[in-house]
Regions:
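Core alpha-helical transmembrane segments of integral membrane proteins
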Residues: 47-147
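Alpha-helical transmembrane helix bundles of large polytopic membrane transport and channel proteins
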Residues: 1-32
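Hydrophobic alpha-helical transmembrane segments of multi-pass integral membrane proteins
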Residues: 116-142, 149-175, 322-359
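Hydrophobic core segments of alpha-helical transmembrane domains in multi-pass membrane transport
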Residues: 56-67, 129-134, 212-214, 227-242, ...
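Transmembrane helix-loop junctions at the membrane interface of multipass transporters and ion channels
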Residues: 202-225, 388-399, 418-428
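Extended, low-charge hydrophobic alpha-helical regions
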Residues: 71-112, 156, 177-189, 293-411
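Juxtamembrane inter-helical linkers in multi-pass membrane proteins
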Residues: 32, 82, 86-90, 143-173, ...
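Short, membrane-interfacial amphipathic segments enriched in basic
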Residues: 9, 27-40, 84, 94-105, ...
């Protein structure tokens, strides 16, 4: 192990393959090597090299995020936002001309159009991000990422097998948690399940984009990358703690055959983008649609079901004020912030739609400062995933009590991290 830099099982596998190659080279007069394999070997010298693999991977991710959040995705999102605003104004004028009841008009314009529309504008960003990720997957590069990350993951108690569910976690936590079933070791599988929610899912992109556009417009990509890296860093710390305490032991061996590099299939990329867009639209017009209506109702009526002129007198404000003091050390003790985080438990996109409904057209900086916005972003990054992901964790662990404990732990980690960020920015 000391000589090869590999663990015992990997070293044995390497010796077997070396022996097989020596036998083949001595027996076969002329071994034909395909052009694709020769090209892949040359590319792997750079992409999986000992000193170049990690810098290249970080460079590729940096370029992907820059193109998504600062160039292509953001511009498309801005254009769509103009269209959504124009459509909302058109609906408003039409309902006013028709003389519809003001309460119903408020539901349609201030509730549904503002809430669902505020989430829809982030569809281009999500599609752009998955366009680049699907290309990386289809070329065979992501398989190299699993191979490259095996050694670093072993230092925190996991193997390269865990990287696949974690990478899926950047899309959605539900299939990522289900993908841990491919991890043979029960110890590794449970550790991976607990770490996967720290990989920021695509549903949170709308929150990040919403806040970075308002508070950090000139550093969008940098803030986005920082959030993703912070989630990974917290996951590493959590893995080290679990490896030293709850999940003592060694990770399972990891051996895989790397496929040749190939040009991405336009059909497979298009199918993946269609699936992501369809899933996003289904959530926008089902879960988020219903959540928006519920939020509008709670912020429009008081406890006696009378229409309120000021949402501060509403049912929603009453609920939010019970919880808001918990977030005072984080810089956002406003009841509207608390209720948006509660709605985020249903679906993370609901955080944006809830804030949009509660703001009533007012700018976001009336509720947040740059400092509290950064703290809020860190909290949304780390606190418990959506209810669908929690239900999946419950099914995989087979215990409601353990699931409740996991949710509370995630909320505590998020609260501590956000309070530290808020305090550090205050000092700086």
């Amino acid at each position: 192990e000391t000589e090869t830099g590999l663990d015992r099982n990997a070293a044995l596998a390497d010796m077997r393959y070396s022996f097989i190659e020596s036998v083949v080279s001595a027996s076969v007069v002329k071994c034909h090597e395909s052009r694709e394999h020769a090209r892949s070997v040359k590319m792997d010298r750079l992409l999986t090299g000992r000193y170049t693999a990690v810098p290249v991977f970080l460079g590729i991710m940096l370029l992907t995020f820059w193109l998504t959040f600062d160039v292509i995705g953001q511009r498309l999102s801005d254009w769509l936002a103009v269209g959504v605003d124009a459509l909302t104004a058109l609906v408003d004028r039409g309902l006013t001309a028709y003389g519809i009841n003001p309460v119903v008009k408020s539901l349609i314009v201030d509730g549904i159009c503002s809430g669902v529309g505020s989430v829809l504008v982030f569809l281009p960003i999500i599609v752009t991000l998955f366009f680049f990720l699907s290309i990386l997957e289809d070329t065979g590069y992501m398989a190299r990422v699993a191979f490259v990350m095996d050694k670093p993951l072993r230092k925190i108690g996991l193997s390269g097998r865990s990287i696949v569910p974690m990478l899926i976690g950047f899309g959605c936590s539900v299939p990522a948690i289900m993908a841990t079933r491919t991890v043979s070791s029960d110890r590794d599988r449970k550790m991976t399940i607990l770490l996967t929610p720290y990989m920021s899912c695509s549903a949170k992109i709308s929150i990040y984009a919403f806040f970075t556009a308002a508070f950090f417009p000139t550093h969008r990509a940098l803030v986005m990358i920082s959030l993703y890296l912070l989630g990974i860093l917290i996951g590493i710390v959590a893995a080290l703690i679990m490896n030293w305490s709850t999940f003592r032991g060694k990770p399972v061996p990891f051996v895989m055959e790397l496929p040749n590099y190939r040009l991405p299939s336009l059909k497979s990329v298009a199918l993946l983008l269609w699936e992501k867009a369809k899933d996003f639209l289904q959530r926008a017009f089902t879960v988020i649609f219903l959540a928006t209506i519920i939020i509008w109702f709670l912020q429009s009526f008081d406890i006696r079901l009378n229409v309120v002129a000021d949402s501060a007198d509403s049912l929603l404000a009453l609920i939010g004020r019970w919880i808001a003091p918990v977030f005072a050390p984080l810089g956002f003790a406003d009841w509207r912030c608390a209720t948006s985080l509660i709605s985020g438990f249903i679906a993370k996109e609901s955080v944006v739609s809830t804030l949009e409904v509660l703001l009533g057209g007012a700018p976001l900086f009336t509720m947040f400062t740059n400092r509290s916005a950064a703290s809020f972003l860190v909290f949304t990054l780390l606190y418990t995933p959506c209810i669908a992901a929690v239900a999946t964790i419950r099914r995989e662990f087979g215990s409601t009590l353990k699931t409740v404990g996991i949710v509370l732990m995630q909320c505590c980690v998020a609260w501590i991290a956000a309070s530290v960020v808020y305090a550090l920015i205050g000092i700086l």
